[in-house]
Regions:
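Residues that define the transmembrane beta-barrel architecture of outer-membrane proteins
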Residues: 57, 87-91, 130-135, 173-177, ...
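Extracellular/periplasmic loop regions
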Residues: 278, 282-286, 291-374, 380, ...
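Transmembrane beta-strands of outer-membrane beta-barrel pores
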Residues: 67-73, 101, 111-117, 153-157, ...
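Residues on the lipid-exposed face of transmembrane beta-strands in outer-membrane beta-barrel proteins
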Residues: 67, 93-99, 136-141, 179-183, ...
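Repeated loop/turn-to-beta-strand initiation elements of outer-membrane beta-barrel proteins
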Residues: 103-107, 145-149, 187-193, 240-246, ...
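Surface-exposed loop and membrane-interface regions of Gram-negative outer-membrane beta-barrel proteins
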Residues: 71-91, 101-145, 157-170, 216-217, ...
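Outer-membrane beta-barrel "beta-signal"
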Residues: 444-465
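N-terminal periplasmic/intermembrane-space "pro-region" immediately following the signal or transit peptide
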Residues: 2-86, 96, 313-318, 464-465
Length: 465
């Protein structure tokens, strides 16, 4: 009996406690995945490395080798009796280092060697200059908003290269030691300022030491032609087919410690296009003083128009006028326009009779006509006729109204994506005006010039990291 009572008591206790336990289980249910390991990602995702940070650096190494063979039977000036043609091959070698860090820094260095074949011995001696020069070396970086700066040795090439040009035809090219401030306030306007201050040594101490304690030590011809430069260039996109540029430049000349002379050049350049017709015009004036201190009062203008008659044929006609001094002018003013840093080989005949080492005192009038023919998918041929005349009165023992004429032929062929071939032939038809201006009264008969150039410029290495 006692045993049955104990069993009954245990059963009653369980009955009383069961609702409480059940309620506790409902109020604190176990987590659905409690005790179950979380699912694992697919094996492919487990093996994929994390994404690298964005690449901010870009580096490119490129080179250029450009030999040019020339037969000069009257290039630069007519040959006279007793002179023989010059035959030579000049050569340009460049190694270019180009580094960019996002949009915050751009470094560019171009090392250059310029020589004539045969100048170096087969077993070369030690070259105290290292055999290389620096064509360009600059850093470009943003300042604030749309204003950036480029500092160092750099090419200054504006518009059509008429006043400031790269002079790429010359084996050495042309570069300046300058600061370039570039401001783009809108999609329509681009404003650029160029500033330079040079020292080059004097005639008595041509090697300028960086520790020179006093004196200007600047002599034209030992380094840059000018001592200081301030230039402002504004480019305005009138529309997709019409462009306008304005230029103001001040060049300061000095010889050693003498007072400097300042020459101002200012003007405008315009280009336009309508269907197959292209046209352009430029006009500039020069005031102030020239390098010798004479008053400067000169001007120039140029107009041109071209029409593409078909995909393979087009014509361009134009005229350039650069003022000069009349042969009987006794005013003492310098009226010769000076395209001081222009790529003049591009405009005034490929034989370089004018504005390449020689500025005609009487100026120049140069109407011309160019025909362009596409001879293949990778080749073309151009032919240009130039007529030359003095811009001012030119009189010696008689009046000269002409300085002769020139014909230039150039053939271009893209041999490979990084190899170009150029072949050219020019002839100059000299007359009494040419002889009087150049001082070659006893010149030889036929004057011509032939050249052939290879331009090899591969990209050697490129990396983004």
């Amino acid at each position: 009996m006692k045993k049955h009572l104990l069993s009954f008591f245990a059963l009653g206790t369980a009955f009383v406690l069961c609702p409480t336990l059940a309620t506790a289980q409902v109020e604190n249910p176990p987590a659905p995945n409690e005790g179950i390991p979380p699912p694992q990602p697919p094996m492919e995702e487990m093996m994929t490395p994390p994404s690298p940070p964005p690449a901010d650096n870009e580096f490119t190494l490129s080179a250029q080798i450009r030999p040019r063979f020339e037969y000069r039977n009257g290039a630069y000036r007519p040959l006279v009796e007793g002179e023989s043609p010059a035959i030579l091959t000049n050569n340009r070698v460049r190694l270019n280092f180009d580094y960019k860090h996002s949009d915050r820094l751009h470094l560019y260095v171009s090392l250059q060697n310029v020589n004539v074949w045969g100048q170096a011995q087969q077993v070369q001696a030690v070259d105290k200059t290292g055999g290389m020069s620096v064509f360009e070396a600059y850093a470009e970086f943003p300042l604030v908003n749309t204003l950036s700066a480029k500092v160092g040795r750099q090419v200054i090439a504006l518009d059509d290269d008429r006043i400031f040009g790269s002079l790429d035809w010359h084996p050495a090219g042309r570069s300046h030691d300058a600061v370039n401030l570039n401001w783009t306030p809108s999609e329509k306007w681009t404003l650029r300022g160029f500033f330079a201050y040079n020292q080059s040594g004097s005639t008595t101490t041509p090697t300028l030491n960086v520790n020179t304690p006093s004196g200007q030590n600047f002599t034209p011809g030992l380094g840059q032609d000018y001592q200081h430069l301030q230039a402002l260039h504004a480019h305005y996109n009138i529309s997709e087919a019409h462009q306008l540029s304005l230029l103001f430049a001040n060049l300061g000349y000095r010889t050693n410690d003498s007072a400097d002379q300042n020459m101002q050049t200012f003007g405008a350049h315009y280009t336009g296009k309508s269907n197959q017709l292209t046209y352009g015009a430029s006009a500039y004036m020069q005031t102030g003083k020239n390098a010798t201190g004479a008053d400067k009062s000169a001007y120039m203008f140029a107009v041109n128009a071209g029409y593409k008659f078909s995909p393979i044929f087009g014509l361009t006609a134009g005229i350039d006028y650069l003022s000069g001094n009349a042969s009987d002018d006794t005013s003492g003013k310098d009226k010769k326009f000076n395209p001081f840093s222009g790529t003049n080989h591009k405009f005034y005949g490929f034989m370089d009779y004018y504005y390449v080492g020689f500025t005609p005192s009487v100026g120049l009038l140069n109407p011309y006509l160019t025909a362009n023919v596409r001879t293949g998918e990778k080749s073309n041929l151009s032919a240009t006729y130039h007529f030359f005349a003095p811009a001012a009165k030119f009189e010696t023992d008689k009046k000269h109204s002409s300085l002769g004429s020139e014909i230039d032929l150039v053939y271009n062929l893209k041999v490979q994506p990084f190899i170009g071939l150029q072949v050219g032939y020019s002839t100059y038809f000299a007359n009494d005006g040419t002889k009087a201006l150049k001082g070659t009264a006893n010149q030889r008969g036929y004057q011509d010039w032939f050249w052939c150039s290879l331009n090899i410029n591969p990209k050697l290495f490129s990396a983004i990291f």
